[in-house]
Amino acid sequence: MKALTARQQEVFDLIRDHISQTGMPPTRAEIAQRLGFRSPNAAEEHLKALARKGVLEIVSGASRGIRLLQEEEDGLPLVGRVAAGEPLLAQQHIEGHYQVDPSLFKPSADFLLRVSGMSMKDIGIMDGDLLAVHKTQDVRNGQVVVARIDDEVTVKRLKKQGNKVELLPENSEFTPIVVDLREQSFTIEGLAVGVIRNGEWL
């Protein structure tokens, strides 16, 4: 399944919830009304896009002719840009789900994170890549981690000593990030366990 846009995810979630609550899918008019579209035609365009992405089937000739091709999302969630102060896996950060077997990675991956920037390029982690992440706080010095400093999320190599943490880039053009644990909020969100080159798995 290709990643859904935020708006497509809203439409998909609405359909799934409506079926769960009423036993039948919503009409185009109901979708338009609930999501603030100007007309049922706008809802129809989103339905066609979802059909092209393989998450639902449009049954012609019926006002409620929508059939979900998967009852619930499976695969690994892809986390895009993370808003300040919010959980990494908050629903609004999830761009879609990818059919990737978590057990391909050791330890197994719990989610994918879209990489932003080139600070880790020397070990093959490029801008736009999908980083497979095992959700854990049990990490060791020298491992590549997903860390949150105050409200910023970053991918770096960990070096911790006492109350000081250094987050080391793998690109000579970048300088390490130094964190004083007595003054700054610092959380390990997970351990990097693999990379999917941008576009290869889509």
UniProtKB/Swiss-Prot annotation:
Pfam families, per database record: LexA_DNA_bind, Peptidase_S24
Gene3D superfamilies: Umud Fragment, subunit A, Winged helix-like DNA-binding domain superfamily/Winged helix DNA-binding domain
Site feature Cleavage, where: 84-85
Active site: 119, 156
Iron-sulfur in keyword set: no
Record keywords: Autocatalytic cleavage, DNA damage, DNA repair, DNA replication, DNA-binding, Hydrolase, Repressor, SOS response, Transcription, Transcription regulation
GO molecular function: DNA-binding transcription repressor activity; sequence-specific DNA binding; serine-type endopeptidase activity
Catalytic reaction annotation: Hydrolysis of Ala-|-Gly bond in repressor LexA
DNA-binding region in chain numbering: 28-48
Function in brief: Represses a number of genes involved in the response to DNA damage (SOS response), including recA and lexA. Binds to the 16 bp palindromic sequence 5'-CTGTATATATATACAG-3'. In the presence of single-stranded DNA, RecA interacts with LexA causing an autocatalytic cleavage which disrupts the DNA-binding part of LexA, leading to derepression of the SOS regulon and eventually DNA repair.
Entry similarity comment: Belongs to the peptidase S24 family.
Annotated PANTHER family: LEXA REPRESSOR (PTHR33516), LEXA REPRESSOR-RELATED (PTHR33516:SF2)
Protein name per Swiss-Prot or TrEMBL: LexA repressor
